[in-house]
């Protein structure tokens, strides 16, 4: 969570380098956006601001989803200043889809984690690190999937490196992780993705959202975000998981300037694959929660605890800032007695 935008010169330089590589070429806009993602350009809003300036100087032409890049001049310094000025005027609260999901669960928990930055007490061995190992293994596998054709080698290598990094901290069995990775590869093949990316940070300056999407699949005219959950699927998707998935579809859709029709939730413990259709009502709920979050934290008060049914088990039990929250409640009881 953060307020406003700082102009990132590194992203601007990456855009300039990419456009120079594409001089005297005509590209589909989708291809240019994909190349931007591959080159670590986290926000396509930066790219479009630069393209607008180049278009005003008649250095590029665009029509019907294509862009023709001419011979670029040495005017990037002037363009940089103009783009920087426009970006510095953006006064929004930027949140991640995961933070919206956490806010839905418990406003106070997110406040303690992100605003107060209370000490988080994480277990030294167990679920937290099991989840980290699963995500790392998927990331390593995806990064090599288009280079290495031996799927068995891909799975074993990714699994081995994840276990090596989290040695002594995880409880999952290697065979279980290997089976999960193989099934994940099947999903990629069945969906017939042309390109697959893992843990790419994406930012929407327009919507005030930033986040790292576990996996993004690209095929023909479709973009599909995939969120991996270490949890078990018990027949019904939790609302917080839906909100995170919807937030990621908004992020990815904004980046590629496309309507994302669906995403996937993949549950590790039950090896379940759930397709999440984009629901406009959920999109409205996501932005409503974002506004509530901004209002809560601008008041400078301690937010309330979770109001979800059975929240003590559902939210408090695994909370990393439970001790800080308990101390707030103890202090409040003491004040009431005075």
Model regions and ranges:
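Metal-dependent nuclease catalytic regions and adjoining charged, substrate-binding loops involved
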Residues: 2-7, 43-46, 69-77, 205-208, ...
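Mg2+/Mn2+-dependent nuclease catalytic core
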Residues: 34-38, 185-295
